[in-house]
């Protein structure tokens, strides 16, 4: 729900898989040929491959490279028990690997809105984000849950939602979109990696 994903990358592409263009066609092969005709001139940046580098590097996001830094104290942080354990722990990026592929279909409506049928965990949040991205009133964006197909947190973020609706509104025709596994792995939001520092104190009991 933090608006840090542009609908299409502009000025800067931040990762392999970030959308830079969308194409609609009446056959997948025609769409592939159209995609192959798109040329993008990239200036390669030095990659940021860990969080510490990203904190110190020049920002690649409008609000900086750190989305959230949390300090959590539970109990008295200055208390010292008979046993104290502290350390830094790291959790790597994970893909939720749900069984159902990412897919959806959007229908333009006669009232100027759009009807989106898609797998999601957050119908109302998705509607709000799509409406905001398309500059439409929320009541003109109608999102219907088309089954979940597994999620595990992986369907909390919008992926193809806005693209589907943009294409349907632009063409005036229903538009279906399906990501294959490679496209999901490259482009969809994964469970984020994290670095966590803990100090635990306890008494003998």
List the predicted regions and their residue ranges.
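Proline/glycine-anchored alpha-helix kink/cap motifs
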Residues: 104-108, 128-140, 163-177, 200
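Beta-strand segments within the central parallel beta-sheet cores of soluble alpha/beta enzyme folds
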Residues: 116, 139-147, 172-182
């Amino acid at each position: 729900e933090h608006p840090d994903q542009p609908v299409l990358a502009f000025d800067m592409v931040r990762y392999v898989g970030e959308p830079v263009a969308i194409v609609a066609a009446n056959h997948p092969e025609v769409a592939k040929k159209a995609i192959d005709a798109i040329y993008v001139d990239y200036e390669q940046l030095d990659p940021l491959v860990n969080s510490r580098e990203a904190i110190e590097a020049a920002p690649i996001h409008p609000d900086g490279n750190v989305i959230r830094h949390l300090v959590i104290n539970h109990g008295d942080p200055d208390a010292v028990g008979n046993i104290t354990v502290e350390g830094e722990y790291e959790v790597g990026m994970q893909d939720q690997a749900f069984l159902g592929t990412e897919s959806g279909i959007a229908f333009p409506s006669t009232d100027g809105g759009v009807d989106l049928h898609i797998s999601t965990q957050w119908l109302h949040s998705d509607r709000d984000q799509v409406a905001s991205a398309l500059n439409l009133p929320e009541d003109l964006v109608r999102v219907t849950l088309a089954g979940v197909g597994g999620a595990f947190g992986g369907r909390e973020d919008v992926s193809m939602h806005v693209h589907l609706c943009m294409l349907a509104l632009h063409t005036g025709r229903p538009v279906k979109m399906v990501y294959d596994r490679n496209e999901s792995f490259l482009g969809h939001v994964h469970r984020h990696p994290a670095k966590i520092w803990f100090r635990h104190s306890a008494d003998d009991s």
